[in-house]
C-alpha cells in the first residue's frame, strides 16, 4: 500500500481529464471558485432564508403563471398559516417558496404576519442592482389591485339567528338565489416581464425595452460601434450586398476565364462565340467543380446571414433614432464622442437593468453593470481583446520570425496570421461571454494550458494548408481586378507606400478605437512619404533620371509620328506583331515609374525634422532612435514599417504559404510566455470583468506611477518594474492619446480651438530644428490659441476638440465623457505631460530658452515658475523645460487650465507663498486692495516696473 501511494505521487493518473474539460468545468464553477469575481459582485444565495428586495422580480415571474388571490384565498391563507407549525419544519426551510410573493402582496394579505428583524435586511451597497432598481421596477409596473375586505365579499342580510332558521334560510336561498350564480370573479391582472408582442408596440417603447433587457453590454456596444462605423442601416445593407456581389463576380468571372474560354482559338477568331466552350460547366474538372460548389454554398450562407442581420440592424436603427436622437443622415457626420455623451445620458436616465433574471444571470451582471459606461469603460469593452494583442506586440511576446535559415530574423505578420492568432489565442482564452476564463488566472494549470495552446497552433497550421490554395487564388484575382486599371492609368502608384499590418499594431494605443487610430495614421502619410524621400539616393536618382530620359524620348518620337500620320503609323509594326500603340504604352509606363523615383529639385533635405513630424502622429519613438534620427539605420527600420503596397500584397500572398511554418515552429515556443502573460497582466474591475492591466488607466494618480524604463539610468533599472511596464512609453502615450480624444467637452469647445491639419510644406518652417539658428523665432507662438509650430505640435496627435482641459472653464472636471472616478488629477496631468512631451523633441542642440518651466522634482534653487512664465514673448514656456528647442507655447500649468484667469491665480499663489496675503492686508475690500491688484496687473501683464505708492 505504501509503494502504491508513493508511485501515485510521481506517476500521472491514467484517466486525467483534458484541459478543455477542465476549462468547461471551470467556466461552470467560476462563480464559486473565483474569489476575486465574487468579492463585492455576486449575491449571497443562502443568507438564512431571509427575504431580500431582489425577490420582487422572481415574484413577478411567479405571478405570470397565476392570478391574484381572491378573498377566499385570503381566508385559506389564514387557515394555512395556523396549520404551518403542525406540518413540520420541512416546508419552512425553502426560502424561495416561503417568499415567492412580493412584500406588497404579503402585507396586503391579512393573517400573514411575518416577523422581519432590522438586522435581516441586506444593505443596498452589497447588492448588484440596489434598492433603487426595485423601486424603479415597481414604478414601471401598474399598481396592484386593492384586496377585498371581508365585509365587501357579500353584504350581510337580515335573517334568523337560530340554527334551524339558518338551515331553512340556506335552503330557500339555494332555491331562489339572491345573486347571479353565473357571475364570476374578474380575472386578476397578470404581470409578465418576458418578451412582449413587439410587433404591435411603439418603436420607441420597443427600443427602450431592448435597451432595458440588454444582458451583454460588450456585444451590444460592439453593435452600436459597428453601426456607427457603417454610417447607418442603409449604408451597411448596401455594403453587405455589394460585398456579396463582388464575391460572386470574382468567383464567376474567374470560373469563366479559366474554364469557358478556348485560348487556342483566340488568334484566328473574329467573334467571342468562336472561342467560347459550349456547356463549359459540365466539362470542368472534379476539383474545379468541388471548389465552385463550395464557394456557392459559402455565398448562400453569407446571403442568409445578411438577411438575418436585417432584424438586428432595424433594432439598432431604432435605438439610434429614438433613444439617442441620431438619424441616418446625421450619423454620417456626428462624432463618436457625441454618441458616447448620449449613451451616458441614456444610462443616467434609465439605470435599471433587465427585469427578471435568474440567480446565475444576476451573478453574471457583476461584469455587465450599466453604471460602468463612460468613455473609458466603453473603450475597454469594445477593445477587450484588442488591448491584449496590442500589449503582446508591444512587449514582443509573440515569436513571429520565419523558421527559414536566411530569413530567421525577419518577422512576418499578415492579415492571415492575425486571423490565426485570434482563432488560436483569443478564442482559447476568452469564453462565450467575452470574459477571460478564470482558469488562465491560476498557475495550477499552467502546463496543461500551455500544451493545449501548442496543440491549437499545430492544428491551425494543418488547417491553413488545406485552406491556403483557395484563399490565394481568390485574393490574387480580387487584387488583379481591383488595382490593375488603377496602375494602368497611373503607373507611378506602383511605388506608393503604406504601413504594414505589424506597424499598425505597433502604432495603435490602448483603448484607441479603430476610426480614431485610422484618422491619426492617415494624417501621418504625407509626412512619412516626405521622410522616405528625404534620404539621399544619388545612384538611384541618377539611374532613374537616365531611364526616364531615354523612355521619354522614344515615347515622344512615336507620339509625334502618330500625330503626323495616324492612319498609317498606328498600324505600323516596329517588331513582329508589336505596333506603335504597344510601344507607346510600354515607354510611357517606364517613364512614369522612373520619373516617380526622382524627387523634386526644390525639396529641402532635413530628414530629422521630417521624422519628428511622423512621430508626432504615429507616437512611435523607440529608445534606439534617440540621437540617431538622421542615420540610415533608422531609415531602414522605418522602411520596414512603411513599405510599398505591392510588396505588402506579395507578403500577404506568401504569408499564406509561410503561416503554417510559423504556427508549427515559431509560435509554440512562446506558448508558456503567452499563458504567463494573460495571468500576470489581467486585472478585475467591478462591473466590467477582466481587462488588460495596461488598458485600465489610473486617472486619479495620473502617470506618476507609470514606469518608464527608458528614462532611468541603466545601473538603476529595476527588472521587475521593466517587466510589468510597457516598452517605448506605450502606456503613457495611450493615456494622453485617450485624454486628447475624450478629455475635452464635445459641446464646450470653440471651433477655433481645434487643431488644424496642414500637409507638409516644401521647406522646413521656423519651428524646425534647422531654423533654430535664426534665433528665438521658434519660441514665438500664437497667443489666441496658444498653438505650437508645426515642428513641435502636440505630442499625442490631432485633437478633435482642442487642447485637453481647455474646453470647460467653469468646472475642474475636464470632460463630461468621463465619470467622476475617471477624472484625471491636475498635478499628475501636468507633470507627466511635460515628461512625455520631451520624448518627441529633436536631438539637436538648441539655443537656451529663457524662463523654462521646472518639474516638481527639480532643485528649489532654480528660478521660480512665476519668473519663467513671463518670457519675452509673453507666452507660457514649453513643457519640455530648458532643453526643448524651438517649441512654441503649449499647455503649461495644465492643472489650472479649467480656470478663467490663469495669471491672476498664479499671482495669488506666489503672493501667498511669499508670506504676504493681499486680502488680509487690504481687509478684503477697499481702495488699498484695488490699488495692489492694479499694481500686479501692470507688473505682470505689461512687463513694466510699477512705481510704488
Curated annotation (Swiss-Prot):
Modification(s) after translation: Phosphorylated by atg1. Atg1 phosphorylation is required for preautophagosome elongation.
Membrane topology label: Multi-pass membrane protein
Domain of life (superkingdom): Eukaryota
Xref: InterPro entries: Autophagy-rel_prot_9
Pfam families (alphabetical): ATG9 (PF04109)
Transmembrane stretches, start-end: 233-253, 290-310, 543-563, 579-599
Disordered: annotated span: 1-197, 748-919
Intramembrane parts of the chain: 432-477, 646-666
Biased composition (Basic and acidic residues): 35-57, 75-85, 129-139
Cytoplasmic compartment segments: 1-232, 311-431, 478-542, 600-645, 667-949
Compartments, record wording: Preautophagosomal structure membrane; Cytoplasmic vesicle membrane; Golgi apparatus membrane; Endoplasmic reticulum membrane
Keyword Transport attributed: yes
Protein keywords: Autophagy, Cytoplasmic vesicle, Endoplasmic reticulum, Golgi apparatus, Lipid transport, Membrane, Phosphoprotein, Transmembrane, Transmembrane helix, Transport
Molecular function via GO: phospholipid scramblase activity
Lumenal topological domain residue ranges: 254-289, 564-578
Main localization (coarse): membrane
Subunit comment: Homotrimer; forms a homotrimer with a central pore that forms a path between the two membrane leaflets.
Function recorded in the entry: Phospholipid scramblase involved in autophagy and cytoplasm to vacuole transport (Cvt) vesicle formation. Cycles between the preautophagosomal structure/phagophore assembly site (PAS) and the cytoplasmic vesicle pool and supplies membrane for the growing autophagosome. Lipid scramblase activity plays a key role in preautophagosomal structure/phagophore assembly by distributing the phospholipids that arrive through atg2 from the cytoplasmic to the luminal leaflet of the bilayer, thereby driving autophagosomal membrane expansion. Required for mitophagy.
Domain characteristics, as noted in the entry: Forms a homotrimer with a solvated central pore, which is connected laterally to the cytosol through the cavity within each protomer. Acts as a lipid scramblase that uses its central pore to function: the central pore opens laterally to accommodate lipid headgroups, thereby enabling lipid flipping and redistribution of lipids added to the outer leaflet of atg9-containing vesicles, thereby enabling growth into autophagosomes.
Protein family according to the UniProt entry: Belongs to the ATG9 family.
Protein's name according to its UniProt entry: Autophagy-related protein 9
